[in-house]
Each structure stands twice: as C-alpha cells, then as structure tokens.
Curated annotation (Swiss-Prot):
GO biological process: cell division; cell wall macromolecule biosynthetic process; cell wall organization; peptidoglycan biosynthetic process; regulation of cell shape
CDD domains: GT_MraY
Organism in which the protein naturally occurs: Staphylococcus aureus (strain NCTC 8325 / PS 47)
Protein name per Swiss-Prot or TrEMBL: Phospho-N-acetylmuramoyl-pentapeptide-transferase
GO molecular function: metal ion binding; phospho-N-acetylmuramoyl-pentapeptide-transferase activity; phosphotransferase activity, for other substituted phosphate groups
Pathway field: Cell wall biogenesis; peptidoglycan biosynthesis
Listed EC numbers: 2.7.8.13
UniProt entry keywords in alphabetical sequence: Cell cycle, Cell division, Cell membrane, Cell shape, Cell wall biogenesis/degradation, Magnesium, Membrane, Metal-binding, Peptidoglycan synthesis, Transferase, Transmembrane, Transmembrane helix
Extracellular side: 70-75, 134-150, 198-202, 247-249, 321
C-alpha cells in the first residue's frame, strides 16, 4: 500500500499543477518581486504563486485514503491537522498579498498568534486528549540524557513549529530551493520513522515526499509556479511536528540545517545593522548574498541541496542511533 500512497500523491500533484497555473494567471495571482533584490529576479514578476495548494491538496486526499487503511492512524490525523492549519495561515497571507494587493500580507503579530494557536491545539490534542503519545522531554543525541519539560514542553512546541515554519518560508526565495530541500528532509524522516517503528509517520513522510516530487518539475528554474506562503509555512510546521512526534527534535537542526542557516543569516544581518549600521552580507537571506557575488541561481540551489543532503544524512544517523 505504501507504493499506492506514493503514486497517488505524485500523480495528484503532477496533474493539478498544470491545471492550476492557467487559473492563477487568469486571476492575476502573480508574485511581486522586491525591487531591492537581485535584478535577475525581476523577470519572475507575475509568476503564479500559491502553488502550494496543489501539493497540500494531494497530501490531504492521499492522507485521508491512508487513514482508512493504516492501523493506528492517529499520527497521520494529527499531522494532517498541522498541515491544514499552517497551510491555511499561509493561504490567507498569500490571498491578502495577491488579491488585496497588500504586499505586507498578514502582520507579523497576526501570523505569529495564528501559528501559536495551531501549536497549542496540537499540544492539547496530543498530550491532553492523547491522540498520540510522545515524550515531553528533549532527548540529547548520543547520550541517555533527556531534559524533562512536562507542560512547559508546549513552549518548546510553539518555538519549534513557529521557528521552522518561518525558516522554510525564508528559504523559499530561489526556484526549487525549498522544494528540493524538503524532499531531502522528508526522505530522511521517512527512513528514520520506519527504522524507529513509527509506520504511520513514515507513511505520511512518503506522502509528503512524493507530493513534492510531483511539484518540483514545475518549480525548478525557470519556475512556472511558486509554492507561496501556502506551501512554505505548512512544510516548516510539518517538519517540526514530525521531529517532535518521533522524539528526535534535535535531529531537525541537521536535517533542516539549510533552513537554520538561512534564518540565522537574517537574524545576524538585522542585528549587525541595528548595532553597527553595517551589513554582514550583501543581502539576506544568505542565498541572495551568493547571487550578488556572482553565483547563478541554479548554482546556489544545487550547492544548498548538496549541503542539505550531507547534513540530512548526519541528522538521519543521529535519529537512528
């Protein structure tokens, strides 16, 4: 059945994208490009966005099929809730930007509060209503040490889900970058899940992986469609949730290392400019810095994918030992 889920997720996305692209163009759901960004990006103005709807719909449909046939499907139900929750936040943000012609979208406060709400509901469903059982301790790799947090673990969940949701969002600035890194990440978590005996989570990772594989051909350079916040916020939230449910939270630092680096580059850039008036990078997130020093977009993407693959394998090794 795993092969069936994989094929279904792949086919649904691959078929939906070319159907959605002309619809988005007709409705003028095009991406606005920052004028201060690399000039090579200006030609992308008007490229359809909100393409994340395709793979999210594929994930929802395939997961609902899996829930019928999978024993102990509660983890899939919970992951589906997070997918829809963070995806909905991203969709509203994209809608305001594209339809209402407000480049700011949701305010940072609105987005943050909505993300916190999803994280708290996830904690309540899992640890209060016991939809799934996972530890409320953070496990330190290569040791038998676990830091117990009890109900304070909800604070960690909020930090982890909100942090990685926004990290993937920041990374989604080059054609295929976030999609490719997510494919690598879900591959690692699929393997880890099956090794750890978490079959339902493994099946969900397979669904994620193949849904994104169906999207990638349309998203690599030159991209015919962008995933938008609809896709990127959902992907980051799902990554954080999977690491939590596997009790392998810190593995995500390696499996999502490029997302972490991208986020840190923005934080360092802002802090440096506020404190010294000088910028560390030519532009942040750091993928734009490499473009501005002369790297082609495709070179940046492939190098970052390679870094993601190597660090992902390290994260996988940490998770299964």
């Amino acid at each position: 059945m795993i092969f069936v889920y994989a094929l279904l997720a792949l086919v649904i996305t691959f078929v939906l994208v070319p159907v959605l692209i002309p619809t988005l163009k007709r409705m003028k759901f095009g991406q606005s490009i920052r004028e201060e960004g690399p000039q090579s990006h200006m030609k992308k103005t008007g490229t359809p966005t909100m393409g994340g709807l395709t793979f999210l719909l594929s994930i929802v449909i395939t997961s609902l099929v899996a829930i019928i046939f999978v024993d102990q499907a509660n983890p899939i139900i919970l992951l589906l809730f997070v997918t829809i929750g963070f995806g909905l936040i991203g969709f509203i943000d994209d809608y305001i930007i594209v339809v209402k012609k407000n480049n700011q979208g949701l305010t940072s406060k609105q987005k943050f509060l909505a993300q916190i709400g999803i994280a708290i509901i996830f904690f309540v469903l899992s640890n209060v209503f016991h939809l799934v059982n996972f530890s409320t301790s953070i496990h330190i790799p290569f040791t038998n040490v676990a830091i117990p947090l009890s109900f304070a673990y909800v604070i960690f969940i909020v930090f982890w889900q909100v942090g990685f949701s926004n990290a993937v969002n920041l990374t989604d600035g080059l054609d295929g970058l976030a999609t490719g890194l997510s494919i690598i990440g879900f591959t690692m978590y699929a393997i880890m899940s099956f090794v750890l005996g978490e079959t339902a989570i493994g099946i969900f990772c397979i669904i994620m992986l193949f849904a994104l594989l169906g999207f990638l051909p349309y998203n690599i350079n030159p991209a015919k469609v962008f995933m938008g916040d609809t896709g990127s916020l959902a992907l980051g939230g799902i990554f954080a949730t999977i690491s939590i449910m596997l009790n392998q939270e810190l593995s995500l630092i390696f499996i999502g290392l490029v997302f972490v680096i991208e986020t840190l580059s923005v934080m360092l850039q802002v802090a440096s400019f506020k404190l010294t008036g000088k910028r560390i990078f030519k532009m942040s997130p750091i993928h734009h810095h490499f473009e501005l020093i002369g790297w082609s977009e495709w070179k940046v993407v492939t190098v970052f994918w390679a870094v993601g693959l190597i660090s992902g394998l390290i994260g996988l090794w940490i998770g299964v030992h």
